[in-house]
From Swiss-Prot:
It comes from Bothrops jararaca (Jararaca). The modification Pyrrolidone carboxylic acid is found at Q1, Q4. This is Bradykinin-potentiating peptide 12c. One of its GO terms (molecular function) is toxin activity. The keyword Transmembrane does not apply. One of its GO terms (cellular component) is extracellular region.
Length: 12
């Protein structure tokens, strides 16, 4: 899970 993503999820 990425901490620097808008949501705690893996990008598409």
């Amino acid at each position: 899970q990425w901490a620097q993503w808008p949501r705690p999820q893996i990008p598409p």
